[in-house]
Regions:
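Conserved PLP phosphate-binding loop immediately N-terminal to the Schiff-base lysine helix
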Residues: 1-7
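Conserved core segment of the aminotransferase class I/II
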Residues: 10-89
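PLP-dependent enzyme catalytic core of the Aspartate aminotransferase-like
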Residues: 14-15, 154-195
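Short beta-strand segments
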Residues: 21-23, 37-39, 112-113, 119-123, ...
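Short, solvent-exposed loop/turn elements at beta->coil junctions and helix N-caps
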Residues: 23-26, 108-109, 147-152
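Conserved C-terminal alpha-helix-loop-beta "cap" of PLP-dependent enzymes
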Residues: 45, 49, 119-162, 170, ...
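A common structural junction motif
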Residues: 56, 138-144, 181-189
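Conserved glycine-rich beta-strand-loop-beta hairpin in the small C-terminal domain of fold type I
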Residues: 82-96, 108-123
Length: 195
């Protein structure tokens, strides 16, 4: 699904320097070794060109070449993304189904239903995200830290949990989601009862 041209929209609105867009191949090529890019107004690009020039002597040209050889062109990249979708879709479907069945009836949390990407963002009762994940960890389920989507991981509400279902096989993921949902309910119950 194409994104709106927000850079062009800002330019039309007379605010061309308002937005910086960033993208990375880290989740689609080599985890932790992807390449990134930035899109912005000419003035913002000129500014960052000066900043980048001071920060580094040279870009990792070997890694850039590796990506060019691997991704080749738009068609190859789209084919790769279809392969990713074939692997990821069942995992996301299962995560969302478990949340719908086990958490939605309780009414204390909400989450996005992504049409792409690699995460489900869940917002639970304020003050319970860290506790829910601590309980899950005690039960053997490791997840991304609470508040990971916030700068420095500091969620002022202690309510956001980013679910990243890409690694485990569906069967393991389903068991992990059962444990997670139980811990999420227990943390909410503790909060409601002031335990």
């Amino acid at each position: 699904m194409p994104f709106p041209d927000i850079i062009g929209m800002c330019e039309e609105a007379g605010r061309p320097d308002m937005v910086y867009e960033f993208a990375s191949t880290s989740k689609i090529t080599f985890a932790g070794g992807g390449i990134s890019c930035m899109c912005a107004s000419k003035a913002n690009i000129d500014y960052f060109t000066g900043v980048f020039g001071v920060q580094m002597i040279s870009y990792d040209k070997v890694n850039q070449l590796r990506h060019v050889l691997y991704l080749k062109d738009r068609a190859t990249t789209l084919q790769l993304m279809k392969k990713h979708a074939a692997v990821m879709a069942p995992k996301f479907r299962m995560v969302l189904d478990v949340l719908d069945q086990q958490i939605e009836p309780c009414g204390f949390a909400c989450w996005n239903k992504p049409k792409g990407g690699y995460f489900v963002s869940l917002n639970t009762m304020p003050g319970t995200a860290k506790r829910a994940l601590a309980l899950a960890a005690e039960a053997g389920v490791t997840m991304t830290d609470a508040g990971a989507t916030y700068p420095y991981g500091k969620d002022p509400q202690d309510s956001n949990i980013r679910i990243a279902p890409s690694l485990p096989p569906v069967e393991e993921l389903e068991k992990a989601m059962d444990v997670f949902c139980t811990c999420l309910k227990l943390a909410a119950l503790e909060k409601l009862l002031n335990i």
